[in-house]
């Protein structure tokens, strides 16, 4: 009997293992999941420890919790990302950051670390209090900031459009429609009693043979040179005189839109060129081993050479600033001048 019991004790785990191996392989392995979670936790802890060690190496006994607190704000993080893409900022940080780190860990600064930490703690507490009063500090971004700055313009535009629409609707309902209705009744009356003008105005309708080719030519020229705009319907006017007025109004709206677009494009030209210059500068800085002054001067000279070559190439093939319409390696440039 004891030997049988021993056999049962040995074979039972084997059967359980066999059943476990024959389970559906699509089901997640709890042991693997736990190991993965532990690995992720260890990596996160390791990264946190590395970050803390880096701060300790750079700051010594200084805590500077206020600085760390401010760096958690989205708008500050966005500012840092923008600054990293500006060539001049990269150069300034590369030249000053090592010196600042040396000053921070120097003996005179470390000697007054307790005093600095005391005021830093007070400043951090004050910042936490401000966050409770103004919680939007934790979520503020440049996009939201721009929306808040543009809020007066957005509201004035919205309610201005509502006012214009209401005024136009009231004018149509209470002025144009009653007057136009009486004119149509009078026209119907003299068409029946005196002269049949076939629904056209008595005087303006006589000008149709002259105005029809003029209106057609004017419409073709407008669409050819000012393509952006709504098309004027041909079958919704009682005479060519009225259609001509609509074509003139359509021409003015298209012209204003085209001129404003060109003005905006020309106004953006210096910004676009500055953006292009920064992209070329960053590309040449990335080619250097580091951002020491010698390599910075070399990258600056290469940038000046590249920009000069671009301008001369644009002048010689009579396409000055055509490269604004192309994509730069640093990002998309506005399509300004062709």
UniProtKB/Swiss-Prot annotation:
Q: Where is the composition biased (Polar residues)?
A: 22-37
List keywords of the entry alphabetically.
Answer: Meiosis, Sporulation
Region Disordered: start-end pairs: 14-37
Question: Which segment of the chain is annotated as a signal peptide?
Answer: none
Tell me the protein's name.
Answer: Sporulation-specific protein 4
List, in alphabetical order, the GO biological process terms annotated in this UniProt record: ascospore formation
- Source species, domain of life: Eukaryota
| GO CC annotation terms, alphabetical | lipid droplet
> Function of this protein?
Not essential for sporulation. Might be a component of the cell wall.
| A matching Pfam family | Perilipin_2
